[in-house]
Amino acid sequence: LKTCLIATDYTCSPSVKDSALDRYFIPAASLSGDFLGGGITPERLRACGIPVRRMFRSGVRKEDAKRAFGIPVDHRHLVMMCGSMGCGPIMSIARRIARALPADQDLTIVCGTNKQLFGRLSRRFCGVNNVHIRSYVKDMALLMDSADLYLTKPGGISVTEAASMRLPMVFIDAVSGCEEYNKDFFLRTGGAVTGQTPREIARTSLKLLSNE
């Protein structure tokens, strides 16, 4: 029986060094040193990227995706997502972005299963026509197809999905551990940018959305 590991973060997780599998499929050749340092022999490594579902490579036209979510096709669209539980300083960043968001740009915030956050944001932005608050989104791929910029925490799968769609990213509030390594990998390779504070993150997002 052959066994393998498919790494879904851009680092060698601590438990990998305790394993003895036939193959280790890793996100990038540049990460080989991390796995070799963990005791994995070179012949067992295969650099092949992180697999994502086909829907994240479907290539739906951005205009059609925007129509599906009620976003005007001539508007720039920022999608803000912080995991299925809606973690991170979303409220602080959202307030700063919404305050300076031009009328021809839209912000969609996905709260996931965080009902308290959904309620707070819905009340805060009630009546703001270009700020849209959503709870759990089933067709996340279609929403990402509608986006011109993606504001997210650096989870291994979610950032790979965005990268496969060639979607520009701004990172929010990485959780200590694997997400820090994911963040560092994408910042180093030019796949994303970030800021040190909610103010910096909001300012960077607005500049990118306006192509400044």
Regions found by a protein language model. Give the residues of each.
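A donor-sugar binding/catalytic signature common to diverse glycosyltransferases
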Residues: M140-Y181
